[in-house]
Amino acid sequence: MRLTKGAGLVLLARDHEIDLRLPMHPRRYDGGTPIRTLLEKGPVEVVNLIADRARFDIDLRVGKVGAEMFCKSGRHVVYAPVGAAQVEIDGHAHTLTEDHALRVRTGSGTNVTVRDGQVIVGSIHDKP
């Protein structure tokens, strides 16, 4: 899970807390864990990627200007959560307005380069 807008989100589990107070810092947890939420500073927006981990591997990465991310075979979403972003995917330029995304499916892997702005890349891969 990644906080994209706002600040001060804390997820409270029975025996620990999951600190999401700062935006764009990844936190992982078992989606089956019962949690409560604490909003310390008002409303927030988050990106959360959920999958059956017995069947799929998942990943959420943040890319800033200049970042090059290899996305292996699978399904990917390149999302611009805060402001517009420009990315290049295997040599093809794409402009994303704020809160818009590209869906990418690849059988052999692909390169995503962030030319401007900031993106989140969510990936889902079949387990071997």
Q: Model regions: which residues?
A:
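Jelly-roll (double-stranded beta-helix
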Residues: 1-128
